[in-house]
């Protein structure tokens, strides 16, 4: 039986929903930085292909970790506040800073890499977009990932090319990864059609990652 993580439920479910209720009551616009790590590839969403991505209306289908289960419930509940809450789904956030929260820094410090094509979010691309959405009091759900897919190996190959030519890494399978992790990892392709209609200037993920690596420090 899976142990209930009280902090997870408090921080990722009760907190956001209570904030949504309070802001709705007071007429205050609320922007919530949620996650797209509530989906996984399946028969309708083929592995590693940029087709039939998960849309803003898609229901969570990933239950591989307690974090994603709780976040999935929160995401669906926020659809009840579409007139007052902006729910932004981000994934695997990337910046040009060498810090432990940066996805690039994380994977360059892993002993082994399970390389899977994924949708990801290059945060500096979205800072002005988030501010614009807040200023215009936009509401509803929006997939906030750069268009396209990129794998861990593609990022590490660029890292070796641009940052450290001596960098090396080893790969292992999803099955091997699952044996050593407490929870499974979400892997998916997010549909960004809605985002691209609103902000057609947004860069594809591989171009933005390369830009981050050129400034990585």
Predicted region positions:
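Non-catalytic, hydrophobic alpha-helical segments
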Residues: 126, 130, 144, 155, ...
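A short C-terminal helix-loop "cap" of Rossmann-like NAD(P)-dependent dehydrogenase/epimerase domains
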Residues: 55-57, 91, 104-114, 164-175
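NAD(P)-dependent short-chain dehydrogenase/reductase
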Residues: 76-128, 132
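Mid/C-terminal beta-alpha module of Rossmann-like enzyme folds, strongest
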Residues: 132-187, 211
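Residue-level signal for the nucleotide or nucleotide-sugar donor/cofactor binding architecture
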Residues: 11, 118-121, 150, 190, ...
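Amphipathic terminal alpha-helices
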Residues: 203-217
């Amino acid at each position: 039986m899976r142990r209930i993580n009280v902090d997870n439920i408090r921080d990722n479910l009760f907190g956001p929903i209570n904030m949504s209720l309070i802001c709705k009551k007071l007429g205050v616009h609320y922007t919530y930085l949620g996650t797209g790590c509530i989906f996984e590839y399946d028969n309708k969403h083929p592995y590693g292909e940029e087709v039939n991505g998960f849309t803003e209306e898609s229901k969570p289908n990933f239950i591989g970790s307690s974090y994603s289960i709780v976040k999935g419930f929160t995401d669906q509940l926020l659809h009840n506040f579409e007139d007052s809450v902006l729910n932004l789904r981000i994934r695997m956030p990337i910046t040009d800073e060498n810090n432990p929260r940066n996805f690039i820094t994380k994977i360059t410090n892993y002993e082994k890499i399970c390389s899977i094509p994924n949708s990801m979010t290059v945060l500096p691309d979205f800072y002005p977009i988030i501010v614009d959405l807040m200023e215009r009091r936009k509401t509803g759900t929006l997939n906030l990932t750069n268009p396209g897919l990129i794998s861990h190996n593609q990022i590490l190959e660029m890292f070796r090319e641009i940052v450290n030519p001596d960098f090396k890494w080893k790969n292992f399978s999803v099955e091997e990864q699952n044996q050593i992790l407490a929870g499974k990892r979400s892997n998916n392709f997010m549909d960004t059609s809605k985002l691209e209609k609103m902000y057609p200037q947004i860069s594809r993920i591989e171009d933005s990652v390369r830009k981050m690596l050129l400034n990585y420090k």
